[in-house]
Amino acid sequence: MDTPLDMLEQLEADLAAADHDESATGVDRRQFMFFSLVAAAASTFGARGAGAQGAGAQGAGALGSLTRGAAQPPQVTPVALGNGEAPALQFMPYPGGTGALMEKLVREKGAAAFARTPHAVEKWSGAVPTNPDDLAFLPAHRISALIKARKITSRQITDIYLARIEKLNPTLNFVVTLMASQARAEADAADAEIAAGKYRGPLHGVPYGIKDLFAVKGVPTTWGSADFKDQIPDYDADVVVRLREAGAVLLAKLATGLFAQNDWWFGGRTNNPWNTNIGSSGSSTGPGSATAAGCVAFSIGTETQGSIVSPAIRNGISALRPTFGRVSRHGGMVLSWSQDRVGPMCRTAEDCAMVFSVLHGADEKDASTVTTPFQFDRNLSLASLRIGVDSAAPKELVDTLRGLGMSPKEIGARPTVAGMQGGGLNVEYAAAFDFYVQRKAKEIGLDLNMVYDPTRTGNGAYGNNRPARPAGVGPEATNPMAAADWNPRFLGGRTARGFEFVQNQRRRLLLVSKWGEFMKDLDLFIAGPNADVGPNAQTGHPCAVLPYKFDVPQFGGGGRGADAAAPAPVYKAQPICGVITGNLYNDDLILSVAHQFQKATDHHTKRPSFA
């Protein structure tokens, strides 16, 4: 029979071996062994200690009771989680929190703060274009005016867009699922309602496309991955419901880069209509390409960190990345509960305002959402606005706005907070896609507990230390992003300590506060096109993208939203875009300023020769 000393020596050996097991089960096993080791030690020393046998027995008994209560690994099976279940913690961009924001709005505006103001579309005047291409490239708010005046029908413009999709999509590759029959039925229903005097508002009968991250009942929702090409939801995302209730006509599910990154998806790369030799950037790659090509009146994109801004710039269109929490993400694929946003991608700033007026507002299915005022001002005066400009701001954009009455002031570098480590995004990625990683690991024989390299951090902890993905395994094998993007993106956050994640969130709130201080004397600012994509994404500030000149672009390589490694492309002339960043919840103001610029210029009216 083993003596307590024998047991002690064996437990010491077992505990040393268990120290290398990083799994949850391994942690439970180490805890069990630790308590057992302490109990054995107490028993050993109690038995050998002269005059202390009673105390030793007492200690062994007490610790034995402790180990009996805590020694066994938990037998409860955790509730399975998919992609959509949100954590209890919610990010709020307003430094004082939701309650303080609501009190401020009520104090300043009363009940009007929560009123939903429909966008007022100007009446159509003049001749109606007879060329289908001219109709297709009209801004969405002009198509709306024509439909309301019954100068064209929803079915007419829907058929024009469907014909253009059939013609251009084989080259541009922006459609994942074409919904032609459903679109025609929705257009006919819209025409019947309008003829009967039941006009729903400015989006009634206007055709659009939506990024294939959003659930549409009975329609495949692929997230850019062939692993999910047969995923057919039985419900509609909130944005789909709002747009349907507004009478908009859904033409197609538009491409998203694989799991919302880049412009590659399981159907290949989505291309830029201004230059089909390059991608349209991502991850809202289909919305960017389809809108620029005149194949939808407007589209809906999403962004975690650059995925609206980057494809809007790449394709030379107008777009709004709204203040965090203004549009519901319910029914959309999750990458980050604390950074994901939904916004319109359009031909003009007024189009963005018209669409956003329908999209925004609180939704009980998305706890991050709030209702705040939105009032687009078509005739805004720039004279009284506090506008900041930095040295990298596009000269053409600044000079035109100055000529319209803007008096800019110089601003310096935007606030940063050291040590944020991406704000914990990898942890959110890993949590949102744990269900998928577990499944894929089983398919290819990847041991998630054995590939971790504790000497490295973040994604790198899994980089060179994980087995190579077998050739041809997985539906993304044709995607050049897959080798780099499949596992590290969702694996890196699995090893983060809860302590580190909380510290990141504390630093993020410091960043939010610093930005609040920086913006307190500004209504908006203009900087270089990509200067603040990262910090803005973490603080929740809104920005508008707009073309400000026509020239040969110099798109940078690498980084989020850039093309996969390839020979340097030859760029061709296209609209070049700038970015206007606003204060929290001033989405209406930055779109109104962008509209003043577009009234004075025509860069947003240019069309790709290919289309």
Positions of the model-derived regions?
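Short glycine/serine-rich loop/turn segments
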Residues: L203-V342, G528-V533, R560
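Short, well-ordered alpha-helical
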Residues: S36-L37, A41, G54, G59-T222, ...
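A short helix-breaking turn/cap at a secondary-structure junction
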Residues: V121-G126, S318-V398, Y462, R466-R469, ...
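Glycine-rich, small-residue loops and helix-cap segments
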Residues: R150, G205, E245, V249-L251, ...
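Gly/Ser-rich, acidic/histidine-flanked active-site/gating loops
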Residues: A136, H141, N169, G205, ...
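Short helix-loop capping/hinge segments that flank enzyme active sites or metal/cofactor-binding pockets
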Residues: E122-N131, H204-W223, S381-G388, G423-L509, ...
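N-terminal secretory signal peptides and thylakoid transit peptides that target proteins
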Residues: H20-A40
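N-terminal secretory signal peptides
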Residues: M1-V27
